[in-house]
């Protein structure tokens, strides 16, 4: 049985906009979230939820990012919850990257209803392509805080892309969801590896496909298709050091880039236009 994209997302939109007191909801992020919670009593949704959400909103209050990025927006729950938290922390921009155009449209409508249009911007398309555009356009040169909750094999490839572009540096914070269930062994292995271990792996050259080790076939193929590959072949930057903490039972891995070790031995962002792409 499908647990998403079976019409329930549009039903949510009709449920919320069909409320008799819709005027009282307008401009109030929490009331929009409350309505999503109410609808979830009858329908399962792949939202971050209240418990994991608090871990991230506490992180936002601590980091106080000027700009935050999320990979995987679904129907906008996280964009509303975290976008509001970013604004309250003094931030100015929240980018929500979503592959599915229908989900992105729903997110836009709910963000508008919540009164967060001034801070939340939804980008439709592949996350790797959108990250590249954010960097090359000059809109985001440095990742302050990034919430990762999209295509599971894309966690590590998108992180390596950000590393390659120079978007990750000391002070960057990553919050990756669902690393325990359904699980993401390749991502956990990477952010927990030493610089020496990553340098050794990098000698094999860039990865030309998604690393799906330990990821179920359903999870690996549900969103992107069996033969899908990353747009860019990248090694990343193995010289970056991460300090990681796994929040249990939430299954949310928070990784802090603490330092950079050694000279730059791999390609820099200036050579990006010469990098193999698909």
Give, region by region, the residue ranges found by the protein language model.
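N-terminal auxiliary segments of SAM/dcSAM-dependent transferases
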Residues: 1-29
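Active-site segment flanking the S-adenosylmethionine/decSAM binding pocket
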Residues: 73, 119-186
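Conserved SAM-binding loop and adjacent beta-strand
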Residues: 6, 23-27, 41-54
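Short alpha-helical
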Residues: 7, 11, 31, 77, ...
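Short, well-ordered secondary-structure micro-motifs
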Residues: 2, 81, 106-108, 132-135, ...
């Amino acid at each position: 049985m499908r647990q998403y994209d079976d019409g329930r997302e549009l039903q949510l939109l009709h449920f919320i906009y069909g409320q008799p007191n819709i005027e009282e909801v307008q401009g109030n992020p929490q009331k929009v979230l409350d309505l999503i919670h109410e609808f979830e009593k009858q329908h399962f949704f792949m939202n971050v939820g209240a418990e994991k959400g608090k871990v991230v909103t506490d992180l936002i209050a601590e980091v106080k990012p000027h700009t935050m990025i999320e990979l995987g927006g679904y129907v906008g729950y996280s964009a509303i919850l975290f976008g509001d938290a970013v604004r309250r922390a003094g931030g100015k921009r929240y980018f929500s990257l979503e592959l599915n155009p229908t989900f992105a449209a729903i997110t836009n409508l709910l963000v508008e209803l919540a009164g967060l249009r001034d801070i939340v911007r939804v980008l439709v398309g592949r996350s790797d392509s959108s990250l590249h555009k954010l960097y090359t356009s000059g809109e985001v040169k440095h990742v302050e805080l990034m919430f990762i909750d999209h295509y599971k094999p894309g966690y590590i490839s998108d992180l390596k892309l950000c590393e390659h572009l120079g978007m990750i540096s000391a002070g960057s914070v990553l919050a990756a969801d669902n690393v325990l269930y359904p699980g993401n062994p390749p991502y956990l292995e990477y952010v927990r590896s030493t610089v020496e271990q990553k340098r050794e792996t990098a000698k094999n050259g860039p990865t030309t496909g998604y690393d799906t080790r330990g990821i179920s076939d359903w999870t690996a193929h549900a969103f992107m298709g069996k033969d899908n590959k990353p747009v860019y072949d990248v090694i990343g930057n193995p010289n970056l050091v991460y300090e990681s903490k796994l929040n249990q039972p939430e299954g949310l891995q928070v990784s802090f880039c603490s330092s950079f070790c050694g000279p730059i031995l791999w390609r820099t962002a200036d050579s990006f236009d010469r990098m193999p792409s698909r």
